Amino acid sequence: MERIEFISRRASDTVFIGECIGRGSTAGDVFLLRGELGAGKTQFVKGLAKGLDVSDWEHVVSPSFTLLNTYDGKIGLCHVDLYRLEGADVTELGIEEYLDTAVVAVEWAEKSLWWDNTMKVSITVNEQEERRIVLEVVDAGRAKVWRDIRCES
């Protein structure tokens, strides 16, 4: 497993990091986002949407109550929030339907089991309110794609 780390000093940095990763994403990529409330998971997904050329990326919101939102871009984006769900409920969302045609971003992913082709995104906040964003990638070839993208604002 390869780890790629980023530091975000403000929300716009988190969006930019997500955008860079979105530019290198392909249909079937699954991002499992973990972090406390307010850590920046939804800001990261806004960036993914921007990188996937979703026209209304600024309007991406956490699907806390709808549970699953989809967006059209050069590649579709399926945004899921599992905060309010228990394990058995997750299978009923139909996330598998999007795995061939979209990038899937799952907030509160620690609440379920997942597929092999996943990237874990952990966001932690330090005392200075900086976000440490760690992308864990199983496939070394995929890790190279994101390492080669310049994510410096």
Locations of regions flagged by a protein language model:
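N-terminal pre-Walker A segment at the start of P-loop NTPase domains
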Residues: 1-20
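Short phosphate-coordinating micro-motif centered on Lys-Gly-acidic
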Residues: 4, 88, 96-153
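Phosphate-binding P-loop
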Residues: 22-27
